[in-house]
Every structure is written in structure tokens, then in C-alpha cells.
Amino acid sequence: MKLLTNANTLKGTIRVPGDKSISHRAIIFGSISQGVTRIVDVLRGEDVLSTIEAFKQMGVLIEDDGEIITIYGKGFAGLTQPNNLLDMGNSGTSMRLIAGVLAGQEFEVTMVGDNSLSKRPMDRIALPLSKMGARISGVTNRDLPPLKLQGTKKLKPIFYHLPVASAQVKSALIFAALQTKGESLIVEKEQTRNHTEDMIRQFGGHLDIKDKEIRLNGGQSLVGQDIRVPGDISSAAFWIVVGLIIPNSHIILENVGINETRTGILDVVSKMGGKIKLSSVDNQVKSATLTVDYSHLQATHISGAMIPRLIDELPIIALLATQAQGTTVIADAQELKVKETDRIQVVVESLKQMGADITATADGMIIRGNTPLHAASLDCHGDHRIGMMIAIAALLVKEGEVDLSGEEAINTSYPNFLEHLEGLVNA
């Protein structure tokens, strides 16, 4: 498709879709709790629909009237063996988190995914879940999907130091630990998004957190709840960046999630000199309205504990850095290599084709700004965040056309993205 280019000013108000991470977890917790869970503002992207379909196949009654998703949970014990393979599509979150649920079930399941998911590492969950007593086999010695998983009712507690900073692995182990008899201890390498921990408490469970240590007991009773999902800050990130880099822009983003483990982009933008204000803060839901204005930006250095707080935003932050004065360095971000694509390689190649001065490193990238961008023909590579980054980059192109193929990947997390983009440009 031909993307919109040569944007002068963007003004408007957007309500971004529900947070993908929270939507997945709300569906899972509703399905493993006793009683009725009602969820408002769920993201209805392809990834979350994979999670919903998986639990439907395991016997959970889930209804969607277009506004509210209602789940009639019967607890872990109410799950039944699916008749077919569980197809997780493109969703690594679905596969890893649901593997934790399945580890304590006494039936065999095979989980499959699309071509992209079939290249993503699963040994990071297979190893600890196997230590707990589940049997997991995949391609190349448990490394890759499809995954065949045989759970057990005799799942053992675990003491485990996460070798990578991964909220998905942490969450899989939490779901497994809930099905054990005894106390588990999970130690994070760096603190990652804590939606699973927050939601356990919301559903009536308990866990102790001290620094990077999480302790929880198995056998807890979870009870269905009413949940409102805030907007996804990872989706809002595209509008934050476009508001900062297109002259005279003024964009208002309503109901954006501001969980402290996810707001790294706000800290980085502020450090770079970006004008962004928070208002209408809801401390219960952890959401706020963000107002973004065009800004003159300075380069920065992003590394260490900051990386897990903005790992999904790094592609669009790389674009932001092309429009900042000076050299921006992103380091300690090797986890980007095992996302839907090798995001270090694909971000660098895509922005280079558009004229950016950007270099890949072993664990990140170096971006020298400020550089104009030019026309190019590009591909999403099956990665929703790459597609959206390119669509925002195209707005900076003054002459010629930017062609994007594979744009359907954007439906993974933001089905209305291109429609919202057009609305801002034409406002």
C-alpha cells in the first residue's frame, strides 16, 4: 500500500485500543478463576483473540457482545483437554503464558503458531516448567514451536532465577506456581512489566514482592472480577512520537495506561526535551490523558534497567532518535532479536533504506540525528510494530512515495491504526 507522506501538522484526539498485555492476562485470569469476570475495553487484536480462542477450546464459556467480554470461570480444575491443536497465531504471549497454565493440567496439548512464532525461543519456558514436573517437547530440543506439553497435577514449586528479563517467562511460572502445593520463589534479572502480579491481587490472590524477588504459594482461590483495560502505551507510543517530530503538532491521547513498569518512553521523551503532559490521572486503573506537542529533541542513551520498561517501544524510539540532535545509543536490548522479527536488524535496515544514519550493534543500535528521510519501498516482515514505525516515518518524507507491503500485520495489536493515522493527517 502507498502510505501517507509529507505531513505538515497533526492535530486531534485519539483513544488508543486496550493494552495488549493486560488484555491477555485478564482473559487468562478470568478463565482460571471461579465465577464471572467482565472485561471492558479489551484489545480485540489477533493476538488476544488467539488467547480467547484457546480457552474456549479448553471448555471455558466466553461471551463477547462487542462492548463487554464475559467469562464464566470454573478455576484451573474446570479446564478440559481441547479437541484440536491450540493455534497461537503470532502471539508469543499466548503461547508462553498458557504453557504455564497447562503445566498443571493432566492432559496433553500441542501448541502451534505461525511462521514467525515458530522461530521464537521457547526453551526459556520449557526448562523451568520441566523442572516443575511438566513434560515439554518442541523442535530442536524444546527450543522452537510446535510445543507438545503434558502437564501434571503433581506440579512442584520452583526457586528460579530468570536468565533473561522477560515478563512472559515470569508470568508463565506464576501461573504454574499457582497450581503447586508449596511456595515458589522467582527472581527477576531486571524488573519487567508487573501486570500479572497486579492482577493476582485484583482476583483475590496473594504474593510477596521484594525488589526483584516474587514469592507465592500454590492452591490459592481466585475469584472473578470486573476489569477495565486501559489504553496500550505501546500503541500510544506511535502518536507520542509523531506529535513530537511533525512541526506544530498537538495530539491528545485519552485513557493511556501509565503502569510504572511500562512508562520508560515517557521518561526517555522527557530526557530528550519532549513536551508531554499528563492529566486526568486514574490511580486505580493506572491511566491518564497524555498531551503531546512538537518539540526540538536532543539525543540520549538508553540501556540497563530502562530497557524492559520500553522494550516494545524501541522501534519507534529509534525513529524518534533520527529526528533528534546528536547521537543516540540503545544498548542492552538483545531481547529485540527474538521478537516477531530480529527488531535490531529490521529497524536498522528499514530506516537506513529511508536515509537514516543508523547502525546495528550486538545489543542495540546507534542513531545519528537529525536526518531527513526519503521515499522507499518497505516490508513489515510480519511485525506489527515495524509496520506502524514505517507508517509514521513516511509522514516525514517530503517527495516521492513510500510503499509498504504486509500491512495486515498491524492488526496484531492495533486494527484501527491506519484509520486513526488518516484522521490525524486530515484533521
Swiss-Prot record:
GO terms for molecular function: 3-phosphoshikimate 1-carboxyvinyltransferase activity. 3-phosphoshikimate binds at residues 20-21, 25, 166, 168, 312, 339. InterPro entries: Enolpyruvate_Tfrase_dom (IPR001986), Enolpyruvate_Tfrase_sf (IPR036968), EPSP_synthase (IPR006264), EPSP_synthase_CS (IPR023193), RNA3'P_cycl/enolpyr_Trfase_a/b (IPR013792). One of its GO terms (cellular component) is cytoplasm. It catalyses: 3-phosphoshikimate + phosphoenolpyruvate = 5-O-(1-carboxyvinyl)-3-phosphoshikimate + phosphate. Pathway: Metabolic intermediate biosynthesis; chorismate biosynthesis; chorismate from D-erythrose 4-phosphate and phosphoenolpyruvate: step 6/7. Its main location: cytoplasm. The keyword Transferase applies. Its EC number is 2.5.1.19. The active site is at 312 (proton acceptor). Keywords: Amino-acid biosynthesis, Aromatic amino acid biosynthesis, Cytoplasm, Transferase. It is found in: Cytoplasm. Pfam families: EPSP_synthase (PF00275). Phosphoenolpyruvate binds at residues 20, 92, 120, 168, 343, 385. GO terms for biological process: amino acid biosynthetic process; aromatic amino acid family biosynthetic process; chorismate biosynthetic process. Monomer. Catalyzes the transfer of the enolpyruvyl moiety of phosphoenolpyruvate (PEP) to the 5-hydroxyl of shikimate-3-phosphate (S3P) to produce enolpyruvyl shikimate-3-phosphate and inorganic phosphate. Belongs to the EPSP synthase family. This is 3-phosphoshikimate 1-carboxyvinyltransferase. It comes from Streptococcus agalactiae serotype III (strain NEM316). The lineage of its organism: Bacteria, Bacillati, Bacillota, Bacilli, Lactobacillales. The gene is aroA.
